[in-house]
């Protein structure tokens, strides 16, 4: 059964990392697409004018698009382009979804948890 947290229009459940789980080691300058699997647990459909936007942390990636409508209860893969820094180290970045009015939402009871990536750039 789909978990609904209080009948909010826009909210999601985080189902997992599709690729590049936390602490994945990447090469300096490597480019890739980070993907997360989520479920729309809200009461409203996400449309193609929604975006996946960078909100804080290390700015190692760009924004992504919602590429098809996601109805309540449906799963979706959210993607953003990443470019690993040239300098070795640990980098973390955080993204949320924005609706067509620019309002942000994430996952969790209050919708305030961000989708995250944590990479280790090799020396």
Role assignments for model-derived ranges:
Residues 1-123:
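Intrinsically disordered, low-complexity Ser/Thr/Pro-rich tracts
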